[in-house]
Amino acid sequence: MPTEIENINPNVYDRIKERVLTANEEDENVPDPFDKREIFDLIRNINDPEHPLTLEELHVVQEDLIRINDSQNSVHISFTPTIPHCSMATLIGLSIRVKLLRSLPPRFKVTVEITPGTHASELAVNKQLADKERVAAALENNHLAEVINQCIAAKG
């Protein structure tokens, strides 16, 4: 975790209501393709590395910035750091990626990128997040893996 907070007073947004599961969604015999809301529900409660808030509360992740194509096995997440020079952007992106890789079936190709035009180092961060070897190497770093696990751990 950082020793000095970059954005000491971030905007905080209301959480959206929890989704009520339908009988069809709970029935294992009914085909139920993944949708944007289901993906959002997986990442909305990721903890911000700087603040005691979730990525949803900071509008870092939003349902309308998720694209999913269940039949083509692809998920694309755009996330928006709270400030354009956020040094935590790569860590946030890694946390989103790890949460989805651990939660979704392995058939999915997961892409995590910064929302275009919202970060000073957008291209460099996106390149790091897209590089499977760099992501794997980052997760082999015990300290970094511990921080990511803290971000994706459920509170309470």
Swiss-Prot record:
<keyword id="KW-0132">Cell division</keyword>
<dbReference type="GO" id="GO:0097361">
    <property type="term" value="C:cytosolic [4Fe-4S] assembly targeting complex"/>
</dbReference>
<dbReference type="GO" id="GO:0007059">
    <property type="term" value="P:chromosome segregation"/>
</dbReference>
<comment type="subunit">
    <text>Component of the CGX complex composed of crb, galla (galla-1 or galla-2) and Xpd. Interacts with crb (via intracellular domain). Also able to interact with Xpd in the absence of crb. Interacts with Mms19.</text>
</comment>
<dbReference type="GO" id="GO:0051301">
    <property type="term" value="P:cell division"/>
</dbReference>
<keyword id="KW-0498">Mitosis</keyword>
<dbReference type="InterPro" id="IPR034904">
    <property type="entry name" value="FSCA_dom_sf"/>
</dbReference>
<dbReference type="GO" id="GO:1902695">
    <property type="term" value="C:metallochaperone complex"/>
</dbReference>
<keyword id="KW-0159">Chromosome partition</keyword>
<keyword id="KW-0131">Cell cycle</keyword>
<dbReference type="InterPro" id="IPR002744">
    <property type="entry name" value="MIP18-like"/>
</dbReference>
<dbReference type="GO" id="GO:0051604">
    <property type="term" value="P:protein maturation"/>
</dbReference>
<dbReference type="Pfam" id="PF01883">
    <property type="entry name" value="FeS_assembly_P"/>
</dbReference>
<dbReference type="InterPro" id="IPR039796">
    <property type="entry name" value="MIP18"/>
</dbReference>
<comment type="similarity">
    <text>Belongs to the MIP18 family.</text>
</comment>
<protein>
    <recommendedName>
        <fullName>MIP18 family protein galla-2</fullName>
    </recommendedName>
</protein>
<comment type="function">
    <text>Component of the crb-galla-Xpd (CGX) complex which is essential for proper mitotic chromosome segregation in early embryos. The CGX complex is also required for cell proliferation in developing wing disks. In the CGX complex, acts with crb to recruit Xpd thus forming the functional complex.</text>
</comment>
